[in-house]
Amino acid sequence: MLKRDMNIADYDAELFAAIQEETLRQEEHIELIASENYTSPRVMEAQGSQLTNKYAEGYPGKRYYGGCEYVDKAEALAIDRACQLFGCEYANVQPHSGSQANSAVYMALLNPGDTVLGMSLAHGGHLTHGSPVNFSGKHYNVIPYGIDEAGQINYDEMETLALEHKPKMIIGGFSAYSQIVDWKRMREIADKVDAYLFVDMAHVAGLIAAGEYPTPVPHAHVVTTTTHKTLAGPRGGLILSNAGEDMYKKLNSAVFPGGQGGPLMHVIAGKAVAFKEAMEPEFKAYQARVVKNAKAMVAQFQERGYKIVSNGTENHLFLVDLIDKDITGKDADAALGAANITVNKNSVPNDPRSPFVTSGIRVGTPAITRRGFTEADAKELANWMCDVLDNIGNEAVIEATKQKVLEICKRLPVYA
């Protein structure tokens, strides 16, 4: 018999220890991975609810199982809030991840072998935008576009490629691009070749919800996003559209039964909570601080002589180009990690090193801002990072930096 007081600590000491260690790591490390964030206790409460027990294949009001009347309410809330938050007619909240949301779009709109125009992974795109190692690169004819010497998306190149190759779909969006994207220009290019415009806004969804970054929703046929990252919800995916009933039916069928079976109702409940939180004034203020903190860090890195890809940032992330410093991204990642500062190694444009080594690091501010970092704190943090990078391998500098990190983490806990 199941009892309410059952717990992991008394039953599975090994797993409980791992959970406790990760909890401590999150509290004592500064998180700068651009795709990571801290979700709220309310979201975690929803994810730990009894909704996890319910199988609900299908959609609200059209389920294949009985007993779905209450999970229907939860999913309807999530759908309505997503539509309200992003200004659209249609939302599918069932994708288990951003990659599965993207996969559903491919399935709904393309046939294997169709031509797709997507941002090169080496220039800031995502695996699912046509990387050869991903399903998108294996099953479709992908033509990559990139950024120019100034670090801006080269729309003229994109148009030339579109006119030459006549893609059926053009993909906008990125995983490592720090500038404003001209969604309107992308749609104009797509219209010239009668292509779908599909935008993956996963990295900037929170900024878009808060009005801190231009929305692609009025321009794209389909938009996808993750629900974590800047949106700060549970890990999951979301599909949005204003393109009409025929499109909505294709997308729904591609998610279920096309790519998934039963949805994760506890995660959908978490999404509903997160969308409600994203409509609060505090969330909008938070997103504004995310951008300010990123700009403050960029300014400090540049003052210390570090090259920033695209020469700045207009969102939550930026890339530090370490080629001139003769430091690998892998070594920078390890040195900063030893000082309790978590980043990820990242390729930079025209990177001479492999993706497993790289010549850069990607830095993002959603998580530090979530725990209360101000612009002054962000500037100070950038200085600490430069100290470590200027002295790669110097254990004394790493240890001194680690102590500073522990102090600020104690002052600004993730969960107070």
From Swiss-Prot:
GO terms for molecular function: glycine hydroxymethyltransferase activity; pyridoxal phosphate binding. (6S)-5,6,7,8-tetrahydrofolate binds at L121, G125, H126, L127, E245, S354, P355, F356. Pfam families: SHMT. GO terms for cellular component: cytosol. Pathway: One-carbon metabolism; tetrahydrofolate interconversion; Amino-acid biosynthesis; glycine biosynthesis; glycine from L-serine: step 1/1. Keywords: Amino-acid biosynthesis, Cytoplasm, One-carbon metabolism, Pyridoxal phosphate, Transferase. Catalyzes the reversible interconversion of serine and glycine with tetrahydrofolate (THF) serving as the one-carbon carrier. This reaction serves as the major source of one-carbon groups required for the biosynthesis of purines, thymidylate, methionine, and other important biomolecules. Also exhibits THF-independent aldolase activity toward beta-hydroxyamino acids, producing glycine and aldehydes, via a retro-aldol mechanism. This is Serine hydroxymethyltransferase 1. It comes from Vibrio vulnificus (strain YJ016).
